[in-house]
Amino acid sequence: MRSSLAPGVWFFRAFSRDSWFRGLILLLTFLIYACYHMSRKPISIVKSRLHQNCSEQIKPINDTHSLNDTMWCSWAPFDKDNYKELLGGVDNAFLIAYAIGMFISGVFGERLPLRYYLSAGMLLSGLFTSLFGLGYFWNIHELWYFVVIQVCNGLVQTTGWPSVVTCVGNWFGKGKRGFIMGIWNSHTSVGNILGSLIAGIWVNGQWGLSFIVPGIITAVMGVITFLFLIEHPEDVDCAPPQHHGEPAENQDNPEDPGNSPCSIRESGLETVAKCSKGPCEEPAAISFFGALRIPGVVEFSLCLLFAKLVSYTFLYWLPLYIANVAHFSAKEAGDLSTLFDVGGIIGGIVAGLVSDYTNGRATTCCVMLILAAPMMFLYNYIGQDGIASSIVMLIICGGLVNGPYALITTAVSADLGTHKSLKGNAKALSTVTAIIDGTGSIGAALGPLLAGLISPTGWNNVFYMLISADVLACLLLCRLVYKEILAWKVSLSRGSGYKEI
């Protein structure tokens, strides 16, 4: 007598072959970009170790510093009064290189095999991250060394974002893209959390390991990427996704056989069959200025400039702010700052889900940006009154600040990179993603720089700067929000309501 089919086998059979491959790509690209962000985070945790008040530390017998020197345990050249400017310069060496490199990276991403491009980028990123940490073991105290390493790391890290968004866009169509990418985009926060926790283990001892360990993990992930990444569904005989929501858009003529779900599936399989029999003609890669002409690219790019300014200022300066204002240790401040990223995960998922249901990407971003401004104001004034208020405010601020940032860099970029105005004639995903994220990275460079310059005048002024940037990000979306409201009015006047996603 045979037993019934094992429950685990039923689970495997419940999903199609295409679904398993899509799940693999989603998981792999999630881990890839989590590693990229993990390798960026240690600098924000180690800052409070590079410059610290040493009055309560026990000075070694052979130390040559004067008895009145309260900075003897800090790491030169960050042991002087201008340490904030120097640390801001190190941050900006990475961010400016990243912003410049991003515009170039998208062009290469459209023209080079993504698997090779990503693998090489991760290996080099792991190398440069480790070299920063080796400065501790090699006893390097020259500012130029840390700046050069940050510039090189910023350039090679630009290989990541356009490539992973392009890869996910190749596998997933527009339906539920916001929700799927909202969950997937939590890799940013997961990477930040891992980077904070790993760096926190060694920050009070051998802080060089705070960089070396994430660097090694990133390099290993680069090898895994080379072995397993699949760029296109057609490469493994899977059906390509449908962009622009064709089935819903063609419901006006349901009797047309070409508009049925079956015919769409068959046409996709026909494409796969043709590609498997012989080489398919590759569509031409879009030019930089051609990508700028896609409706919405300029507005969302400029919005992201200010949204990312706010997000990256928190990324690089939040642990130091918590340590200075709430008087936590470097490790405690780093651990507490991870709650901002926890909020970012929630905010990204909520933003994707709401924008899918309403079909209003710009409106979703605008509403969250409007709510973020008063929340940042409240966090600055009451966020450090107690541990409970700090936890709650960090999660709320993280969700409202990172939600729009996550939505623009994922679902919006993928939507615009496969925009119907392209008519399927151009490969634009990587270039559009690079333009949007590259413009945002200019803000990411400006934010920490301005924070470093403004913070000596008081943390209140830093928060006023962040609130101003948040309001500007919101205003830049006004035209697109107006268009979405008009579209909803037309939809409601026809009695159709919102489309079901």
Curated annotation (Swiss-Prot):
Membrane-crossing segments per the record: 19-39, 88-108, 118-138, 145-165, 189-209, 210-230, 302-322, 334-354, 362-382, 391-411, 434-454, 462-482
InterPro entries in UniProt: MFS, MFS_dom, MFS_trans_sf, SLC37A1_2, Sugar_P_transporter
One annotated GO molecular function: glucose 6-phosphate:phosphate antiporter activity
Catalytic activity: D-glucose 6-phosphate(in) + phosphate(out) = D-glucose 6-phosphate(out) + phosphate(in)
Membrane topology: Multi-pass membrane protein
Segments of this protein annotated with the region Disordered: 240-262
PROSITE patterns per record: MFS
Keyword Metal-binding tagged: no
Regulation: Inhibited by vanadate but not by chlorogenic acid.
Record-linked Pfam families: MFS_1
GO biological process, one term: glucose-6-phosphate transport
GO CC entries: endoplasmic reticulum membrane; extracellular exosome
Assigned keywords, A-Z: Antiport, Endoplasmic reticulum, Glycoprotein, Membrane, Sugar transport, Transmembrane, Transmembrane helix, Transport
Glycan attachment positions: 53, 62, 68
Signal peptide residues on this chain, from the entry's feature table: none
Chief place where the protein resides: endoplasmic reticulum
Tissue expr: Detected in intestine and pancreas. Lower expression is also detected in liver and kidney.
Location in the cell: Endoplasmic reticulum membrane
Source organism, top-level taxon: Eukaryota
Family matches, as CDD domains: MFS_SLC37A1_2 (cd17344)
Described purpose of this protein according to its UniProt entry: Inorganic phosphate and glucose-6-phosphate antiporter. May transport cytoplasmic glucose-6-phosphate into the lumen of the endoplasmic reticulum and translocate inorganic phosphate into the opposite direction. Independent of a lumenal glucose-6-phosphatase. May not play a role in homeostatic regulation of blood glucose levels.
Family stated for the protein in its record: Belongs to the major facilitator superfamily. Organophosphate:Pi antiporter (OPA) (TC 2.A.1.4) family.
Name assigned to this protein: Glucose-6-phosphate exchanger SLC37A2
The organism of origin for this protein: Homo sapiens (Human)
Gene that specifies this protein: SLC37A2
